[in-house]
Amino acid sequence: IISIMANNQKMRTESDLLGSVELPADVLYGVQTLRGIENFRISKFHLNEYPLFIKGLAITKLGAAEANHKLGLLTDEKFNAIAQACREIMDGKHHDAFPVDMIQGGAGTTTNMNANEVIANRALEIMGHQYGEYQYCSPNDDVNCAQSTNDAYPTAIHLGMYATHLKLVEHLKQLIESFEKKAAEFADVLKMGRTQLEDAVPMTLGQTFHGFASILRDEIVHLNEAAEDFLTINMGATAIGTGICAEPGYAEPVSYTHLRAHETE
């Protein structure tokens, strides 16, 4: 339902079990996100300040949609619209529609619903419908199909952390390159090596920088090993680990086929 306020701002009405609320007609999020904004004003850090986490959410929703589409749970029209919405978010669009506080009750339910509503409303727009017309594409029944906050949210965190890890390694490699350049530049500059806060034996300044580079190379190896744990996810476990509400044959494709295909995008 679209209404016009006294200041000529268009509003739309959405409802949940607690009642109806009005929100600006042009915002991509919905009633659950609005309730989250009102209920959780805790840290002053908001979801839209963490783009790699939002990207992880979009990748998670895209992987789930691909698996559900192949199982016949999403029509071609719904799937194509949801997939386009997810890819737009992965490309950095619509991040302003994720305003909820990072600290919230419910183990991330508000964040999960924020993503579901944004993707659903953008999908509705792609299909030619109005925001909030969830009978055509539902945040819960379609975007969140076969998922729970308890598997989608930690999966998104893992993917966001893995993307952060890749950026960290990229920057460390640049720093190693800089150290190696300095090692070559100062290869003939003598200095005293020090141990126990005292002068010890001669060495070159270049050797010092070469040592810095070697340490960082070792750290990259350790980081890469640790980051493998981020690729261990629980998608398909749903709410309590039993896979309830997910179709047989959903968990393996969503985890091993679809999410793996998008992990480095």
Regions found by a protein language model. Give the residues of each.
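A helix-coil-helix interface module used to build multimeric assemblies
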Residues: 6-242, 246-256
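Single conserved hydrophobic/aromatic residue that forms the stacking wall/gate
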Residues: 258-265
